[in-house]
């Protein structure tokens, strides 16, 4: 199964996450199929950037987002049917 999840990067006590499409059997920070964006929770304002068109494509192909990534996608207006225009 293909999943959309976060892969941790950064240093100790300074997390940084890549939002990736990966096989569910691969390690959290291991091999991935495509990088869709990133999430940086550290700083004055948490920074989130996602390629909405590619995320919508992978959702339409049956990729299952993790709970956290599903919340991010909903916040950004991405669904299985495509990108919602705001």
From Swiss-Prot:
Classification via InterPro entries: Ribosomal_bS16, Ribosomal_bS16_dom_sf
Keyword rRNA-binding attached: no
GO MF annotations, alphabetized: structural constituent of ribosome
Pfam families in the cross-refs: Ribosomal_S16
PANTHER family per the UniProt record, alphabetical: 30S RIBOSOMAL PROTEIN S16, SMALL RIBOSOMAL SUBUNIT PROTEIN BS16M
Name this protein carries in UniProt: Small ribosomal subunit protein bS16
NCBIfam families assigned: S16
Alphabetical GO biological process terms: translation
Keyword field contains Ribosomal protein: yes
Record's GO cellular component terms: cytoplasm; small ribosomal subunit
Organism of provenance: Acidithiobacillus ferrooxidans (strain ATCC 23270 / DSM 14882 / CIP 104768 / NCIMB 8455)
Keywords of the record: Ribonucleoprotein, Ribosomal protein
Family of this protein: Belongs to the bacterial ribosomal protein bS16 family.
